[in-house]
């Protein structure tokens, strides 16, 4: 196991809207363009702009430092752990480059049998695959769009599950029922719809007059969706699927808020 300076825990269970989740969103958005460092005072101020009091803000900072995302540096400053950069870059691609499947795109099947003696590996593999948006075909067998192959390979390495897994790529899965019906079994479409509904409701509550807070809360609310929703092709989804509305809301608000939010951050961090 790596030291805190090299090992970073991806806090995938951080609930959107929580202090820890908002802090991670601020770090992911702004520490790299700020040069990788920020003062403790500036970080607490930015969290204050999100309505978070100093005490819980400092508690959250301590938590993400313990997770390895931040490193304490001299002068009451925090630096982004270089080991976290690949994780954040993967997140950028998923969050800002939304991709949906089209007819004829390949699928990736992941078959894994993890020994009982390594139950922790099995649990991590299952939870990470589900967060990645994989559907469950059968116990030990998952399916994703093939364009996620790189993320799946990284996940298998990070969870130490690669020796137990075999990957298959196909353009023509043939379940015993129509593929649309099979997809409804493999993915919990009701839960995915609820995530879209939650996001769209959160968008309605944003105050664009405070662009920094609105943008961070937009990103924090959105960040789960591009993971848990695999972007299935339209012909496998209900006719009233809300995915396109969510994407349009996110991209439109991002375009309106991002620049003003960045100006605010630079002013606080200067």
Q: Residues of each region from the PLM?
A:
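Short alpha-helical segments that sit at the start of domains
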Residues: 1-29
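A short, conserved structural fragment
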Residues: 65-75
């Amino acid at each position: 196991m790596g030291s805190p300076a090299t090992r970073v825990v991806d806090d995938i269970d951080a609930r959107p809207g929580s202090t820890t989740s908002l802090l991670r969103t601020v770090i992911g958005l702004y520490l790299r363009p700020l040069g990788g460092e920020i003062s403790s005072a500036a970080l607490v101020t930015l969290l204050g702009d999100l309505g978070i009091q100093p005490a819980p803000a400092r508690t959250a900072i301590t938590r993400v430092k313990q997770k390895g995302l931040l490193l304490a540096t001299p002068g009451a400053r925090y630096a982004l752990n270089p080991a976290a950069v690949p994780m954040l870059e993967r997140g950028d691609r998923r969050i800002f480059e939304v991709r949906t499947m089209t007819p004829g795109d390949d699928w990736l099947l992941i078959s894994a049998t993890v020994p009982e003696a390594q139950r922790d590996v099995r649990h991590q593999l299952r939870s990470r695959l589900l967060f990645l948006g994989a559907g469950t075909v059968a116990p030990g067998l998952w399916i994703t769009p093939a364009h996620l192959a790189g993320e799946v390979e990284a996940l298998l390495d990070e969870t130490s599950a690669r020796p137990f897994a075999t990957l298959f790529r196909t353009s023509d899965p043939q379940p015993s029922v129509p593929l649309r019906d099979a997809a409804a079994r493999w993915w919990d479409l009701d839960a995915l719809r609820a995530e879209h509904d939650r996001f769209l409701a959160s968008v309605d509550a944003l105050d664009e007059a405070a662009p920094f807070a609105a943008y961070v809360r937009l990103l924090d609310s959105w960040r789960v969706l591009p993971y848990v929703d695999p972007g299935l092709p339209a012909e496998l989804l209900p006719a009233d699927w809300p995915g396109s509305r969510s994407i349009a809301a996110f991209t439109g608000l991002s375009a309106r808020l991002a620049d003003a939010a960045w100006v605010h951050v630079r002013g606080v961090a200067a």
